[in-house]
Structures are given as structure tokens and as C-alpha cells.
Amino acid sequence: MAVALAEAGHRVAVNYYERASRAEELCADLRARGFVAQPFQADVRDEPDVARMVAEVEAALGAVEIVVVNATGHQPLLSIEQQTWQSYLDQLEFFVKSPLLLVQAVLPSMRARGFGRVIQIGSEVVELGNPRFANYVAAKGAQLGQTRSWARELAASGITVNLVAPGWIPTERAFSATEAEKAAYAQAVPMQRMGVPEEVGRVVAFLASDDASFITGQKLSVNGGNTLE
């Protein structure tokens, strides 16, 4: 997503929590290609940390016009008997609290300029209802509701709010499945394959562009038709 936004001409701030080397490597690669990119450390579940990060981003790169909410944490499979309220809160911290803190931090300047793009990264699991995953599915469902409510509230201020719902995309961080598991998933997808990160990035860049100026409150599924509606 950072690459797609940079290629679309945006200055990119890459947030990281612990993996500084990966964020710095990504930004260095983008700068080598002539783009503007800089890493910023923060725990997006922590309000003071988010406020500090946004202030640092604005000082280094200018006003924040686009926010892509993509932070996530550990996602263990747990039966109903194994799940606790804390296991739900752990997911809500990433998918409801962190979007709230980020949007609250950038909203004053977005309102003042009459422009903003908020792009949440959701998941197809809300439609699929994956078993042993209710805490994650519930948090992602809440994130979708949050997106739609914000879209109505902020539309008159020139701020769009949308959600991209990817399927199972192989990424460096989260992809530890077996070949059999990957093959089984791909076979169930109408397009008979898994997606790639670049396909999600292009949709994010589209929603950030002027071409999407009249699109708000929408969920765009990037999953090869796996949740045909």
C-alpha cells in the first residue's frame, strides 16, 4: 500500500511499532526511486503516542490528507470455550480503538481544509464468519460499522471514509500457512487463486485519488469474488 500511494504521487509516512528495520528499508527503497517516504514509530493503540506521531509527521511531511488504517496484532484461532473478553478487547484495540485515535488526531486539520481520505483495511471474514475466530470477526465487523457511521458524519466536511476488505493475501508478516491450506483456499475462490498485496494497494490508491471523490461509506472487497454479494 505504501508503494502504491508513493507511485500515485503521495508523500508517505510509514508507521511501525517494533520492526524499525523493515520500515526503514521500505522507505529507503521508495526514496531510491525518487519518492518521499519516512518511517515513524508509534503504538497506534496509545493516545499520547498517536498524537506525538501525527505531530512528527506533520512537521516532517506536511498536513495529513490520507490515513490508511492497517495496524494489526496476533490473531490466534480460539474456540468459544477458549475465548475470553480480553481476547475480544485485544482485537478491538487494533480495529476500533486505533482507527478512532488516528482519525481524532488528524480530523481538525482535515476539517479545516475541507478534505480528507480515511481508508480502513477490513477483512472478508465479516461475511464468511470463520469458525474459532469470533473475536477477530466481531472486531472487523465493528470496524465496518465505524466506517459507515463516520462516512455519514464527515461527508459534509469533504472527508470520505471507506473500507477495503481483502481476502487471504500472502504477506511477509502473516503468511505461515501450509501449501495444502493455501491450495484449499484458492480452490474455493471463484478466480481460483490468492490475491497479492499489490492488488490491495492499487485499490487503496484509487480510494485516495480524485477519481474516488464521490465514493464514501463503501466496502470494497478484494478477494477474487470469495464473498459475492
Q: Which stretches of residues belong to each language-model region?
A:
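Catalytic Tyr-X3-Lys loop
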Residues: 65, 81-100, 115, 119, ...
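Short C-terminal tail/terminal secondary-structure segment
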Residues: 77, 128, 187-188, 193, ...
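Canonical Rossmann dinucleotide-binding motif of NAD(H)/NADP(H)-dependent dehydrogenases/reductases
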Residues: 1-13
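Substrate-binding pocket helix/loop in short-chain dehydrogenase/reductase
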Residues: 78-80, 84-92, 174, 181, ...
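Catalytic loop of short-chain dehydrogenase/reductase
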Residues: 73-74, 87, 91, 119-142, ...
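A short, exposed helix-loop element centered on a Lys and neighboring polar residues
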Residues: 103-104, 148
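Short, small/polar-rich loop/turn modules that mediate ligand/substrate recognition or access, typified
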Residues: 62, 155, 160, 215-217, ...
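Alpha-helical segment proximal to the catalytic Tyr-Lys
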Residues: 108, 152-156, 213
